[in-house]
Amino acid sequence: MMKVLVVVALLVTLISYSSSEGIDDLEADELLSLMANEQTRKECIPKHHECTSNKHGCCRGSFFKYRCQCTTVVTQDGEQTERCFCGTPPHHKAAELVVGFGKKIFG
């Protein structure tokens, strides 16, 4: 039963990864958009860096693109501001854990 769960989780992860790759391929149909995409990859926001002003500019991790995660911060004056950072969502962390575990088991 445990092997079946690991295989199913691995398949779901691989399908998610391949679909995210397919979306990236669709965005780069023309040469100009491909060149612009390469330029944005060089200028993307790394993990754990602030993305408040550019919420779609996070870099790509080993399997998935990082997501801009926001939180509301209350200053000492009582003023609320939104602060965002690039990070890995929990379900992506779980998928990466399953893939890493699968690599250790199956080599």
Curated annotation (Swiss-Prot):
Signal peptide (residue range): 1-20
Similarity comment text for this entry: Belongs to the neurotoxin 19 (CSTX) family. 03 subfamily.
Propeptide positions: 21-41
GO CC annotation terms, alphabetical: extracellular region
Membrane-spanning parts: none
Full protein name: U1-lycotoxin-Ls1y
Compartment(s): Secreted
Molecular functions (GO terms): toxin activity
Keyword terms, alphabetized: Disulfide bond, Knottin, Secreted, Signal, Toxin
Disulphide bridges, residue numbers: C44-C59, C51-C68, C58-C86, C70-C84
